């Protein structure tokens, strides 16, 4: 378990930074390329541990995939061409891999066994396995399919009209992917609109998808046709440097090629509402996945209330938003965030515990956090608990803390941002 020591940044963070490829889009590009007909070339791929797990799993099912840094070539097998894996499909720490892949495996004629690390073993799978079972897939696992390892034997699926109790792109995507080979029209309705990378990419691969408010539909029997994919930078990774630029004195950062999918830009809306000073320059208007260059500088922030429809648009950014709130004048309330409890860690409890160690005034209830600003943070020993987003949030916190901050289990950041610490060090010079 590796440690990282973070020293206070006295002269600000300054410079340009190219944000690594979007994790959600990278996963989907590999998966959709694997079940498409033809060869897909992916540029801007994120070579982090999670996305490499996706490549590994589909290679195990006979897909020819060549990865060279951030460029990947996938020779598609078509929807019916995947082969029965000879070994257990290991997703590592990736919830996206296991949930979306379950939707694909639900319509394959073979048996597969899927598992991940100890974090995955604690994450709820029934939200995905239940609707897939309703469609006709044979799925089992610990506690009746609630937890991994899962065994999946696909079947002749029938379309369903499913109302999801949670706004989850992973649940929605698993059902839609199963629906590609189901008889009839599959529909998923959510309480709030979740990120729509699956819908956008399916359309790019030639699948007709219908969107009606909070409902997404597709007809079974459609094939995917290979296409080239350009992956923009991950706004969830950019969030750490957006907050850093706003709260570290004497900072000015230019973040290049940041994905600006409107279902993901809640962090931008929140920073604007808090009073951050930044500009957004679109760079590829009209693209399937829009992107922009963002310039941000040290700002005076104020506390706000965050909740409702915006939560699915910033669910992964809440840990670093909580950090920003510790440096804002007044009280910030983050509510309706119960989904944080079933991430890589219980992120409500973890954020509160670790920021409290650094001197923040922060409280938790069942689905919310209340943060009292403005807090003077002091260095301490903290822990990511294997959660990449907690690790990066704590690193930014260490930059404004008095004295050194030691982060235990710091290597977790490699899941989504392998070069994070190197970039941070470069910008601090």
UniProtKB/Swiss-Prot annotation:
It comes from the Bacteria. One of its GO terms (molecular function) is 3-phosphoshikimate 1-carboxyvinyltransferase activity. GO terms for biological process: amino acid biosynthetic process; aromatic amino acid family biosynthetic process; chorismate biosynthetic process. It catalyses: 3-phosphoshikimate + phosphoenolpyruvate = 5-O-(1-carboxyvinyl)-3-phosphoshikimate + phosphate. Pathway: Metabolic intermediate biosynthesis; chorismate biosynthesis; chorismate from D-erythrose 4-phosphate and phosphoenolpyruvate: step 6/7. CDD domains: EPSP_synthase (cd01556). Keywords: Amino-acid biosynthesis, Aromatic amino acid biosynthesis, Cytoplasm, Transferase. Its EC number is 2.5.1.19. One of its GO terms (cellular component) is cytoplasm. Phosphoenolpyruvate binds at residues 23, 95, 123, 170, 347, 389. The active site is at residue 316. 3-phosphoshikimate binds at residues 23-24, 28, 168, 170, 316, 343. It is found in: Cytoplasm. Monomer. Belongs to the EPSP synthase family. Catalyzes the transfer of the enolpyruvyl moiety of phosphoenolpyruvate (PEP) to the 5-hydroxyl of shikimate-3-phosphate (S3P) to produce enolpyruvyl shikimate-3-phosphate and inorganic phosphate. This is 3-phosphoshikimate 1-carboxyvinyltransferase. It comes from Bacillus anthracis. The gene is aroA.
